[in-house]
C-alpha cells in the first residue's frame, strides 16, 4: 500500500435505478485534489449541494447508510464507498442526480470495475492515517449488532452474521489485505428474506429491486 494519497485519472459514469426509490439515476466519479476525501454532489438540486462521506452526517443505518447535511439526504451509499475503500482510493468527487446511487447488480463490483477503468493516480501528498491505541466497542441495543476495534500491528477485518435461520446459519468472513477485496468481496450482494418483502414494500422500499438484483432466500429448508 502506497503512503501517498490517490484519486482517479478520469471521470467515469454509471447509470441504473435506486434499489429503494426505483428512480433512474446517473452517478459520475470524478478526480479530486488531495485531502478532498469522498464527497457527493447532488447535481439534481438547486445549488448542487455537497455532502461529505463523514460519520457525523450519518442519520440512519436501517436497510442502508443514509447521509444528511443541511436537509439534503443521500441514501444507500455503502456499495459505492466499499468500492473506493477496497481499491484504496482516497479522494473522489461523486456527482449524482438523485438521492440514491444505482444499485446495479446489488454488489460493489460494477463500481470497482468502473473505477479501475478510470485508472488510479497517485498524488503528491501523504496519507493521513488513524492509529488505534485503545479498544473501542459500540453496540446497537435495538439490532444487537456490535463492532469492536482493537489495536494491532496488522490490518484485519472479521465479520460475523447470524440471522437465526437454517438456510444461512452463522457466517464469517475475514479480510487481511485490501488487495483481496476485488476478487473475494466486491461480488457480495445485498439480499432480503422472502418474509420481509411485503413489509419492505409497505414501507415504500425496494421499488427498484428485481430478484436478480437482490436475492431473497427463504428462511427455512422448505
Region locations from a protein language model:
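Phosphate/diphosphate-binding glycine-rich loops and adjacent basic-rich segments that engage nucleotide
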Residues: 136-193
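Conserved small/polar residues in nucleotide/adenosyl-binding loops
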Residues: 212-219
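A generic local secondary-structure boundary/capping motif
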Residues: 14-17, 28, 81, 144-150
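N-terminal basic/disordered segments at the start of proteins
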Residues: 2-48
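Broad gene-expression machinery/nucleic-acid interaction feature
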Residues: 9, 22-24, 91, 133, ...
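Long, charge-dense
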Residues: 104-144
Amino acid at each position: 500500500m502506497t503512503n501517498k494519497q490517490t484519486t482517479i485519472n478520469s471521470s467515469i459514469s454509471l447509470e441504473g435505478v435506486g434499489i429503494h426509490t426505483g428512480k433512474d439515476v446517473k452517478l459520475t466519479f470524478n478526480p479530486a485534489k488531495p485531502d478532498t476525501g469522498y464527497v457527493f454532489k447532488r447535481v439534481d438540486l438547486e445549488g448542487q449541494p455537497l455532502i461529505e462521506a463523514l460519520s457525523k452526517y450519518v442519520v440512519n443505518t436501517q436497510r442502508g447508510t443514509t447521509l444528511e447535511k443541511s436537509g439534503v439526504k443521500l441514501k444507500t451509499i455503502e456499495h459505492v464507498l466499499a468500492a473506493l475503500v477496497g481499491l484504496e482510493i482516497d479522494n473522489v468527487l461523486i456527482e449524482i442526480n438523485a438521492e440514491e446511487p444505482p444499485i446495479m447488480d446489488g454488489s460493489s463490483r460494477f463500481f470497482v470495475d468502473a473505477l479501475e477503468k478510470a485508472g488510479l493516480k497517485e498524488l503528491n501528498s501523504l496519507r493521513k492515517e488513524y492509529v488505534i491505541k485503545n479498544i473501542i466497542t459500540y453496540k446497537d441495543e435495538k439490532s444487537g449488532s456490535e463492532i469492536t476495534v482493537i489495536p494491532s500491528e496488522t490490518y484485519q477485518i472479521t465479520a460475523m452474521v447470524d440471522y437465526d435461520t437454517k438456510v444461512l446459519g452463522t457466517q464469517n468472513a475475514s479480510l487481511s489485505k485490501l488487495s483481496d477485496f476485488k476478487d473475494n468481496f466486491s461480488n457480495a450482494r445485498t439480499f432480503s428474506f422472502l418474509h420481509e418483502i411485503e413489509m419492505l414494500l409497505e414501507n415504500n422500499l425496494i421499488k427498484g429491486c428485481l430478484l436478480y438484483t437482490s436475492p431473497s432466500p427463504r428462511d427455512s429448508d422448505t
